[in-house]
Amino acid sequence: MSVRTKVLGLVDVMMRVPPVMVIDEILKMDMGMQSWLYPDKDKASGALATPTEAPAVPSGQDPFTSIKELFSHMTTSAQSVLEQSIEKASEAAKTHGMLSSGFNSLMNELSKDQTLADVLSTTTVKFVLCVFAFLSAACIFMLWTRHLVMVYMFLTSLGLTFLSYWSNVSALALTERSPSMVEDLMSLNTTRLLDSGGVVMSLAPHLMAQWFMGMLFAYIHLGPRFEHVQRSMPIIFASPILLAMLPLPAKVVQHLPVVAVFTPIILTKITLMQSAMEASRTVYNGYQYAMNFVSNFGLSALIENEWQRLNVPNVLRVFWTIRLIQGGYALATTESDEPLDLMTATQKLLVDGCETMTAVLGMTGVISMFCHYIGRGFQWYLLTYDDEEKSLGTVSAVLFYILALQTGLTSLSPDKRFIRLCRNLCLLMTALLHFLHNIVSPILMSLSAARNPSRKRHVRALSVCAFLVVLSVSLLYHLWSQQSISTWLLAVTAFSVEVVVKVLVSLATYTLFLLDARRQFFWEKLDDYLYYVRAFGNSVEFCFGILLFINGAWILIFESAQNATGGGIRAIMMCIHAYFNIWCEARAGWSVFMKRRSAVHKISALPEATPAQLQAFDDVCAICYQEMYSAKITRCRHFFHGVCLRKWLYVQDRCPLCHEIMMYTDKADENAPEAEPAPAAQAEQPMRIYPRDDANNAAAQRRSPERAPVEASEQAPATSSSSAAATIGAEAVSAIVESAAAVGEARSLVSVASSSSATHRISASGSSDSSYMTASAQSPPPTATSAAAVATAAASNTTHMFRMSQDQQ
């Protein structure tokens, strides 16, 4: 990325910060609602803000003092009377019911109360203005960069106009108490003119500033650009100061600033009227673009696209950093008798840093950046460059924001807010330990399984595991020694112990793989040991998941009554936790257990190979390519390790080499006498091969494939009367001959399979599958070889086509 692109990106981020600051200030005012609607937010604020409280500003120095006093007077005067009336009405409703005469009379008094009407009207006006400002700031924040530049140019030109007016008023105030400058110039009174404290030296900065503001306004304003007006704009801005040098009456001089800003105001109004339709068209086009994008790609794709376009994380980080610097500067410049305590200042900054939802979002962005670089640091230490850790910052940010919403962080009093913030950070730290374990665990497995000889990588991975265990144990020791038992402490304990168990399971698996790598012979019990270790870890995680669900239910029922929003979010998160971390995990664990149990049962049914058979076999296992000192014999007379065969049975029941059914079934045992007719009966009856497909079975039952060549040869003379029929018949005869050869091949293969299955039935005490070849009087078996199935299907289809040609003839 070039330097120019980085600079433009930084400028775009900085331009989007002011709308966020406006939204933050509106949220500080609680959207214009009265402060008595949120009483808990201002309680105990004195204990936290007393040492750093700013001194009272004199009313003459604050231009908004009268407005603040008006709203505060209205609030304080109406609050006590209104609260008393509401309390009386609520008590009457509780005592006598809402339909009682006392309650109705109190409600009538409240409806006629002028104080209540004034408060409601003032609150309504403030709320409407705050909503309008909130929506305007949000729209400005979401504008494209080109439109954002135009908005800032308009606001800058408007600001220059008011700044010029204020500067002219201040400059003219200096000339009122001084002699005429024209007389000094005409008399060449250099002493007064060059006096450092004189009026000339005082007006010089104002004159230069007016000239510069006039040139800047002429350059950036969006109104009509007339050539003469553009050139005379600096003179128009500086005209009040220049005319004040003349001996004019005081009444005329007082109105000069208003006359000077008349031209810029006219140009600004023209710009506003011309841009009104353009602004509404831009908003409408943005709405249409969003609707089309959602209909084509979905809402999530729109949010992701706009998130990247607006560069929201960096905007929030810059906003929160500016907010933190502003708060730190206010604390540093506050005059106080006591010295500034670092701990108190940090506490005050952190509390103010999560005062509103926008501030919480900014803190979330900063925490996300810290977690991202922590993950990058551990990756660098572990000598790995996997891209999975890129989600570490995003997941930690989402987790912190959900915790803030669940606990109602912004609605708490400052002291409670600081305690809750520290608890949320502890929970986030335990989650971060889980993420770090997810990074180091695959590295441990790869190092042990690949037999990596690099000791440096082994030592680094093991040191990270030791760090996770030590940090978790230290955190638990500190919390249990300093805090009393609570639901939050139980949650942190569960997460920390789960981290320790996960690390121990990873180390045990790593140790088993290392021991297996050092052994000279095949370790058949390795799979069992790994299964037991991982089953222990998964069982502990499942138990902690149930414990956390019960803990969350307790918090939801007994501790979240005053926070409806947080309670709703907690309920949703509990449902997600119950489904993914409890139900899905239990179902997956039960499935693995049943597969393993079924595989063990099937393996135990197979015969064990004797040393003589292994010596005669004298080969390796076809699955793991290791020497066989013990083996299981399948129904198709293949030798495999019992452990390897068990892993294979997790996937399918067919032999890895010949794809035959490996296991013996009791159903075949019952049908064994019927499946093996006498040799004389087999000689008298034609043999049939039944394919797997039901449609092909029906075709095979309709016409025997072995008789097809004979019938074709008998009907061949009849097909010579028509050339078209002869062509079809010739093709059919050739296809049938080929299919008959395939059937003969399949019959030989099936006869070998039947002899092999007979041997297996003897060795396994009659527990085998049904025979693949039966007499014509017997019902077709459920399975057959794939070669026989293909050959039979081809023969039956070709015979059917040949019969159709004969019917046409």
Swiss-Prot record:
Tell me the superkingdom of the source. Eukaryota
The record ties this protein, via InterPro entries, to:
HRD1_E3_ubiq-ligases, TRC8_N_dom, Znf_RING, Znf_RING/FYVE/PHD
- Residues crossing the lipid bilayer are 124-144, 147-167, 200-220, 233-253, 256-276, 350-370, 392-412, 425-445, 461-481, 488-508, 539-559
Q: Where is this region: Disordered?
A: 696-724, 752-788
Q: How does it sit in the membrane?
A: Multi-pass membrane protein
Tell me where in or outside the cell this protein is found: Endoplasmic reticulum membrane
Point out which parts of the chain are RING-type zinc fingers, as ranges.
Answer: 621-659
Q: Does the keyword Endoplasmic reticulum apply?
A: yes
Q: Which UniProt keywords apply?
A: Endoplasmic reticulum, Membrane, Metal-binding, Transmembrane, Transmembrane helix, Zinc, Zinc-finger
What are the record's GO terms for cellular component?
Derlin-1 retrotranslocation complex; endomembrane system; endoplasmic reticulum
Biological processes, Gene Ontology terms:
ERAD pathway; negative regulation of growth; proteasome-mediated ubiquitin-dependent protein catabolic process; protein ubiquitination; ventral midline development
Q: Relate the assembly described in the record.
A: Interacts with VHL. Interacts with the MPN domain of CSN5. Interacts with EIF3F and EIF3H.
Query: What function does the entry list?
Result: Plays a role in growth inhibition that is dependent upon COP9 signalosome subunits CSN5 and CSN6. May modulate signalosome levels or compartmentalization. Probably functions in the same or a related pathway to VHL during early midline development.
The text the record gives for the protein's domains is:
The RING-type zinc finger domain may be essential for ubiquitin ligase activity.
Name of the featured protein: Protein TRC8 homolog
